[in-house]
Amino acid sequence: MILELDCGNSLIKWRVIEGAARSVAGGLAESDDALVEQLTSQQALPVRACRLVSVRSEQETSQLVARLEQLFPVSALVASSGKQLAGVRNGYLDYQRLGLDRWLALVAAHHLAKKACLVIDLGTAVTSDLVAADGVHLGGYICPGMTLMRSQLRTHTRRIRYDDAEARRALASLQPGQATAEAVERGCLLMLRGFVREQYAMACELLGPDCEIFLTGGDAELVRDELAGARIMPDLVFVGLALACPIE
């Protein structure tokens, strides 16, 4: 069995797979301590290998790797940046500046689609990347996600105060808000959907209307109605991780 981890800005996503990437366990952790606590309950699983992708600092990643190697008898593989992987060419002028999670997601998408594709990852930040049919990464965009937009309004606007339960209820409709939570949540979601629509229009122009659309990240479901033909793949980064860090 293989332990896989995607260490993002806010959360650590993990899963244990066997065979053809069949998941036998998994979860989300808000900190290294929470992750270790979750994984401790899985120590009975015969984990023989570990691979991870991290957007954290090198020091933070090294500390996490050390803790993982104490939990399981493994030597963890850590994905690194590259100019090229699996037929995809990194489009950044300084390839090392492209976030590793973005890189693995767009590589995975092209590997699965075998044609031009648009990849939108809706997490704390929202990223969009365009990949041509020949594997050339054209570049992409970054904007705040729902969580960031919401937190910035709460932080910098004194009279905006509401809890997460109110936020969830507010998204039951997109009618004009009649309370602060409704106005903020629906306004942010409409901005997010507008961004997604614009990305699709740009992809059709640059890549052609038959390009494949991939949605991933925690808020992908919030925009799926905007792109009826999109493939929603929560584990897209893990597909790319397997390409970057193959294990026999």
UniProtKB/Swiss-Prot annotation:
Cofactor: K(+); NH4(+)
Main location: cytoplasm
Record-listed E.C. numbers: 2.7.1.33
Annotated signal peptide: none
Catalytic reactions on record: (R)-pantothenate + ATP = (R)-4'-phosphopantothenate + ADP + H(+)
Cell compartments where the protein resides: Cytoplasm
Binding-site residues, K(+): D121
Record-linked HAMAP family: Pantothen_kinase_3
Protein name: Type III pantothenate kinase
Organism for this UniProt entry: Pseudomonas aeruginosa (strain ATCC 15692 / DSM 22644 / CIP 104116 / JCM 14847 / LMG 12228 / 1C / PRS 101 / PAO1)
